[in-house]
């Protein structure tokens, strides 16, 4: 599975753009701020129906315009699929071969994708919400049962919190409605917690293996899932928190409060890990994500690497390149402000590759290399 070509209209700093890609390696070279990351984001959007950069679709529209459109032609098992993502300033639409999905969420996991960025260490430093979001994105691509449960849970948590706020404003609480919300939250929350526990157990040994291959040292690493939802008495704990929920006007127990502890030598890596160890940790986690998605979906995910070599020492860069060349069997996109640094990917590489020079929203393909001339796309 890979993306063959793309067409953008009013997408960030690209008023209009059409590009054809290699099924192997694609390098976006250009200065910082030229639009390399925006190109990666357009591919991510077509795979996951949302940006990894912008918090709203409105922020994706080219300045001064009222809409955007992104089209991608994907190859899967010798068949071509045309994916179109439109936003008219108010409403988004997603179609495959001009046919709309009954629910946009049906697209999640069909064309799996993973992005590595220099900001991935924020997963370690930031709040539990960011870690939950990361694992939710991973598990949702891997398992639609998980995704459906997550959508239901998020819906009912909003409804329940709205009911709690009404009570705070002096309105009587509809206990029948509240009980219905509670039932649905407990039901979908248990599915989410069970799936998180199940998939983390599958992910952990893959992650630990990648960390050991990337790190020059021999630190012990671990990821622990923290939840009380799977405890036998959780339903009673949930009900007992109702008085507190009324006071705070929000639901205080459930999987939306879970966390994932990142550990190195049995200590929180947030406090005890060096900058290099933290970067190695998240890179290993993303590579493990690739392997898990490949196993669950039956497809090679598209791997997007955004300036990932920035601030990595030479040894870790060399190890990362070796692992990517050895284990990443699908399509790869790399952005780099220093293409000479990324050129090591192409040395002794049998994969087809293309280099694109990006300058302030304008993109040109560099002349094909000898390996490209000798390789069919």
UniProtKB/Swiss-Prot annotation:
Keywords: ATP-binding, Cytoplasm, DNA damage, DNA repair, DNA replication, DNA-binding, Nucleotide-binding, SOS response. Signal peptide: none annotated. GO terms for molecular function: ATP binding; single-stranded DNA binding. GO terms for cellular component: cytoplasm. Gene3D superfamilies: P-loop containing nucleotide triphosphate hydrolases, RecF/RecN/SMC, N-terminal domain. ATP binds at residues 30-37. InterPro entries: DNA-binding_RecF (IPR001238), DNA-binding_RecF_CS (IPR018078), P-loop_NTPase (IPR027417), RecF/RecN/SMC_N (IPR003395), RecF_2 (IPR042174). It comes from the Bacteria. It is found in: Cytoplasm. One of its GO terms (biological process) is double-strand break repair. Belongs to the RecF family. The RecF protein is involved in DNA metabolism; it is required for DNA replication and normal SOS inducibility. RecF binds preferentially to single-stranded, linear DNA. It also seems to bind ATP. HAMAP family: RecF (MF_00365). This is DNA replication and repair protein RecF. The lineage of its organism: Bacteria, Pseudomonadati, Bacteroidota, Cytophagia, Cytophagales.
């Amino acid at each position: 599975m890979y993306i063959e070509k793309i067409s953008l209209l009013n997408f960030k700093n690209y008023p209009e753009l059409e590009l054809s890609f290699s099924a192997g390696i694609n390098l976006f070279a250009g200065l910082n701020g030229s639009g390399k990351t925006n190109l990666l984001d357009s591919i991510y959007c077509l795979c996951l129906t949302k940006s990894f950069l912008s918090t709203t679709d409105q922020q994706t529209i080219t300045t001064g315009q009222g809409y955007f459109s992104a089209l991608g032609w994907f190859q899967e098992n010798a068949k071509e699929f045309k994916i179109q993502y439109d936003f008219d300033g108010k409403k988004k639409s997603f179609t495959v071969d001009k046919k709309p999905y009954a629910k946009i969420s049906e697209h999640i996991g069909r064309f799996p994708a993973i992005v590595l960025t220099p900001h991935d260490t924020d997963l370690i430093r930031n709040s539990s919400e960011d870690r939950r979001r990361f694992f939710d994105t991973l598990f949702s691509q891997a398992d639609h049962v998980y995704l459906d449960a997550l959508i239901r849970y998020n819906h009912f948590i909003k409804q329940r919190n709205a009911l709690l706020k009404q009570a705070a404003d002096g309105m009587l609480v509809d206990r029948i409605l509240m009980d219905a919300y509670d039932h649905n939250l407990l039901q979908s929350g248990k599915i989410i917690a069970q799936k998180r526990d199940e998939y983390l157990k599958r992910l952990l040994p893959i992650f630990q293996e990648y960390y050991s291959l990337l790190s020059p040292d021999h630190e012990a690493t671990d990821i622990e899932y923290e939840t009380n939802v799977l405890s036998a008495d959780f339903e009673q704990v949930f009900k007992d928190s109702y008085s507190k929920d009324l006071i705070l006007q929000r639901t205080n127990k459930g999987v939306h409060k879970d966390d994932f502890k990142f550990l190195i030598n049995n200590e929180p890596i947030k406090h005890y890990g060096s900058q290099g160890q933290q970067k190695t940790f998240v890179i290993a986690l993303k590579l493990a994500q690739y392997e898990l998605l490949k196993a669950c979906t039956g497809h090679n995910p598209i791997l997007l690497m955004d300036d990932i070599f920035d601030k990595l020492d030479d040894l870790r860069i060399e190890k990362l390149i070796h692992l990517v060349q050895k284990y990443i069997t699908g399509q790869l996109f790399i952005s780099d402000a220093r293409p000479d640094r990324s050129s090591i990917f192409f040395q002794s590489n049998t994969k087809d590759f293309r280099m694109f020079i990006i300058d302030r929203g304008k993109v040109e393909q560099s002349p094909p290399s000898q390996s490209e001339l000798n390789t069919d796309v």
